Amino acid sequence: MAGMSLQHPWAFAFGLLGNIISFMTYLAPLPTFYRIYKSKSTQGFQSVPYVVALFSAMLWIYYALLKSDECLLITINSAGCVIETIYIAVYLVYAPKKAKMFTAKLLLLVNVGVFGLILLLTLLLSAGDRRIVVLGWVCVGFSVSVFVAPLSIIRLVVRTKSVEFMPFSLSFSLTISAVVWFLYGLLIKDKYVALPNVLGFSFGVIQMGLYAMYRNSTPKAVLTKEVEAATATGDDDHSAAGVKEHVVNIAKLSAAVDVVKTREVHPVDVESPPAEAPPEEDDKAAAATAAAVAGAGEKKVAA
């Protein structure tokens, strides 16, 4: 790292800044997991973003180890591996049995199976610089596939004309992170680090533009499939919060070459349509409604 700071002082500066931003982003889910710990329940939140984040960090550590002078990638992704492992462990402690089984299977499939296959193929079928090229394009492909995720958020914002699921601070931080890591990759002449962040920067700018466009708009009464699916099972508040948390998780994953995180969110109230009363209950319902209206009128006058 000392050699890098002397030969590429600007690269070292941007890499260090990227480490700081990414580390803060890794710590963003702490309020969420504090809630999980206090309530002894995962509250409908999903484990997928954390498993994918761990896989991403593992990939970039392997890539950095194959190259020289990539200490800055190793440090931040090593920290990411530790933090994401802790998040997943906490999730497994408090998740219901079905969610535990799903998370365990996902870990075995992605972090053991897929990563093991990549490790085996790159070690056996390639060598030297060719191995770095193959793994570099694997990392780029994974990053690009993750960058598709913000499209669902952008579509949701356009459909609902609401920026509830896309806070400006999040979009801004993702854009800055993408710029920093792009400059780092550009200065060290590593296209595999730089290229994915061009797409990340583009999506960040689009999201900030949509925020400026819809921040004062009246949201449409559109119930998305994601929220409908969440509220179909379990508590409305916790399930809706889980959907929002998952959306934010995936958006953050596309911020930098090694980052996928969450932020604390507040539950979204999603009201279910009232069940239609039987015909024989019409008179009772009408009477109850009249009484409620009268009571409300009395309170208003008293106020």
Swiss-Prot record:
Keywords linked to the UniProt accession: Cell membrane, Membrane, Repeat, Sugar transport, Transmembrane, Transmembrane helix, Transport
Pfam families, per database record: MtN3_slv (PF03083)
Main localization (coarse): membrane
GO terms classed as biological process: carbohydrate transport; sucrose transport
Topology within the bilayer: Multi-pass membrane protein
Regions crossing the membrane: 10-30, 45-65, 73-93, 106-126, 134-154, 168-188, 193-213
Domain MtN3/slv residue range list: 13-98, 134-217
One GO CC annotation: membrane
PANTHER family hit by this protein: BIDIRECTIONAL SUGAR TRANSPORTER SWEET14, RAG1-ACTIVATING PROTEIN 1
Record text on subunit structure and interactions: Forms homooligomers and/or heterooligomers.
Family as reported in the entry's similarity comment: Belongs to the SWEET sugar transporter family.
Protein name according to UniProt: Bidirectional sugar transporter SWEET14
